[in-house]
């Protein structure tokens, strides 16, 4: 297995221009494909998950031109539901941001009835999709499980979604609601979505209506409890759509600066629609100096204090706090993060396991993690298993800010969202 050893870093200094957000990139591509008109999507992320979406769109008859550097994509919208040859199979890797929205969009009524199969890697077949399928079935969608109930692969017939009242469980993933919201305007009738339970990752939900509005559709949101969307509408191309820098990916550079230096991250700012921008506020609460601009966030180190906080609203970026906690004074508790368990891997167990290898004292609860700090000279060298999870690989790069080197196994797994992560991290790592 490939491995990468990072030597101890004495300070962090520099500027990072963020690649496009994964979730925004895939949503923008899908909306552009469904819209009337041609859309130029810029600052598109070049990564595995985006390639799975692009390959699926091509198989569904969508024409697009991708620039040589793969960051600009001109998409010719089809102006309604997808059409495809019966028996099509789409392989979506482990890309939840492709699987969930496509599962909903492919239910929309086509001119000719056809079946499509959505499948992916073994881990994708372990990632729950029942809450979305249950909701789609309430609207009249025809979806079958091909292996295990509640999980991909799925067989979908484009017989339509017919609106009405729909209840969806919001406790596992905000992507289920996102998928339903994006498909609803092209359905056969008006839809009223009622959220059961506490909606997780609320700021991630805010992204979806904001993007839908850019493509000409309004969503009425009643305090995250109910959403109303009119049916029989069309998305209209905004002609160009700029994908914001990935706020989750910003977290590693910002945390590195909070621990040992100063960094300016561009491509995201105070007006970002991404919830993970709030990560910088958590660093500020821990003691870091944070400066916000229209198109940048700057963080400078200061003495960090541990924190006890519900981080359900920023689950991806919260992982970075678990590492930052080692460098703070006093214990850190990250709460209400059960949804870590249903991501690319069971992130709660994975992070607790790898932190212990470093010599950290960690308590793993069902939906929380408690971490004690470590003195810089007390870190043990460890080989960090990454579980084919891009965010674990990126998080644990921060261990090199101690007095000990760290070895990351399978570093190439960052290709899911940030193929050039380690070279970017090296640019801001100084050793004098």
Swiss-Prot record:
What Gene Ontology terms describe where this protein resides (cellular component)? cytoplasm
Q: Which reaction does it catalyse?
A: 3-phosphoshikimate + phosphoenolpyruvate = 5-O-(1-carboxyvinyl)-3-phosphoshikimate + phosphate
The protein's superkingdom reads Bacteria
List its EC numbers. 2.5.1.19
| Coarse class of the protein's main subcellular location | cytoplasm
Query: What are the coiled-coil residue ranges?
Result: none
Q: Where in the cell is it found?
A: Cytoplasm
For the ligand (3-phosphoshikimate), the binding residues are: 22-23, 27, 173-175, 201, 316, 339, 343
Q: Which UniProt keywords apply?
A: Amino-acid biosynthesis, Aromatic amino acid biosynthesis, Cytoplasm, Transferase
Q: Does the keyword Transferase apply?
A: yes
Indicate whether Lipid metabolism appears among the record's keywords: no
Q: Name one Pfam family in it.
A: EPSP_synthase
The family database entries (CDD domains) matched by this protein are listed as: EPSP_synthase
Q: Where does phosphoenolpyruvate bind?
A: 22, 96, 127, 175, 347, 391, 416
| SUPFAM superfamilies linked | EPT/RTPC-like (SSF55205)
What pathway is this protein said to act in by its record?
Metabolic intermediate biosynthesis; chorismate biosynthesis; chorismate from D-erythrose 4-phosphate and phosphoenolpyruvate: step 6/7
Give the record's GO biological process terms.
Answer: amino acid biosynthetic process; aromatic amino acid family biosynthetic process; chorismate biosynthetic process
Which molecular function terms from Gene Ontology are attached? 3-phosphoshikimate 1-carboxyvinyltransferase activity
How does the record describe its quaternary structure? Monomer.
Q: What is this protein called?
A: 3-phosphoshikimate 1-carboxyvinyltransferase
Q: Which gene encodes it?
A: aroA
